[in-house]
Amino acid sequence: DWWTFHEMRKKRINFFGYVLIFLPSLVCALHLILLLCGERSMYSFRIVSGTILLFTVPKLVFTIISAGGNRLGRLFHRDWKHIQGVAFFFACIVAVVQFYCVTVGINRLDVNRVTLASPLLPKSFDGYRVVQISDLHLGSYFSDDSFVRTVVDSVNSLHPDLIVFTGDLVNESPDEVLPEFVNALSCMHAPDGVYSVLGNHDFCVYKGFPSEQEVRRATDKVVRLEQSMGWEVLRDEHRLLVRDGDTLVLAGTDNVAKPRPRREGEYVPPAGSLKKALRGVPESHHVLLLTHDPWHWRREVTSDPRVLFTLAGHTHALHVRLGNFSPAAWIMPEWGGKYVSRN
């Protein structure tokens, strides 16, 4: 914004031009202040993230190209008169792409088929089909269940042996799970059932409930809603999947996340426990683990030889993905796709 202001001073821009360019940043700053002051509002979070995607990122692209072009022009003693136009062109392209992502892309469904192989997998589970869905964040769809029904139809069309959900059914409150969503998600079926674990949002800590008791009650309501849909919620526990005499252990933990600074008076739900989830599982058995945050995998899971495969969600590729690239790769070792540990 400073560079934009600096460039605008050279041109005859009226008051409304300044308002048009800087108002998004002011709105973003206001809601960012609310978030930093403890106003844990998903509405404010959406305003901040949406403004960054639609306005800040394109302006950043404009600034980098414009400033870089001017600096190179001075370095090589050339007058690049059209650099502002080039910068504006690329900024517009980025803005259009971002607009597509937050309007059309949010309802785009991709089915990724991944083959997991291991000589340790019981033979009866060769060809076993697991469908994983994650991070529905139902509050993002308000009362429109069309995309959720598309997801359900896609899942059922794959004829899975097992369906798993790896957390974040809601944004901040069980009130987001409207009856139409319950009806839709109740229609997912698989011979070995539908299992789920809780993600960080499912603990409802972002709603700003006034007490720990209310947070716990909200979390319990999320669990009951999932159970009412026919899902079995694994909270640091496991179940046995049996096929033709062979056994595969299905385990699930509550969210285990990277520690972060805690605000004064903030309630932080207890982390899930892999040890508790695998209590009683013999060393000879192998485990398919459900967890929410992939950070958990390298932190604890890879050191347990019983865990053969781990399924996680959470990252959303930071909501920005172009092919196999996402900025998430800069801050998350595991952000999407298949990863193999040599432990």
Residues of each region from the PLM?
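Binuclear metal-dependent phosphoesterase catalytic core
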Residues: D1-E7, V61-F62, S66-A67, V97-L121, ...
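Non-catalytic terminal accessory segments
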Residues: D1-N107
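Membrane-embedded segments
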Residues: N107-N112, A117-R224, M229-E232
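Active-site-proximal beta-strand elements of phosphoester/diester hydrolases
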Residues: R113, G127-S140, T247-A257, L288-H292
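Beta-strand-turn-beta hairpins that frame and shape the catalytic cleft
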Residues: A117-V131, W231-E232, H238-A251, P282-H286, ...
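Active-site metal-binding loops of divalent metal-dependent hydrolases
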Residues: S134-L138, G167-L169, N200-D202, E237-H238, ...
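Conserved beta-sheet core of the metallophosphoesterase superfamily
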Residues: S186, V249, L288, D293-N343
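Binuclear metal-dependent hydrolase catalytic cores centered on His/Asp/Glu-rich metal-binding motifs
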Residues: Y206-W231, R243-V287, W297
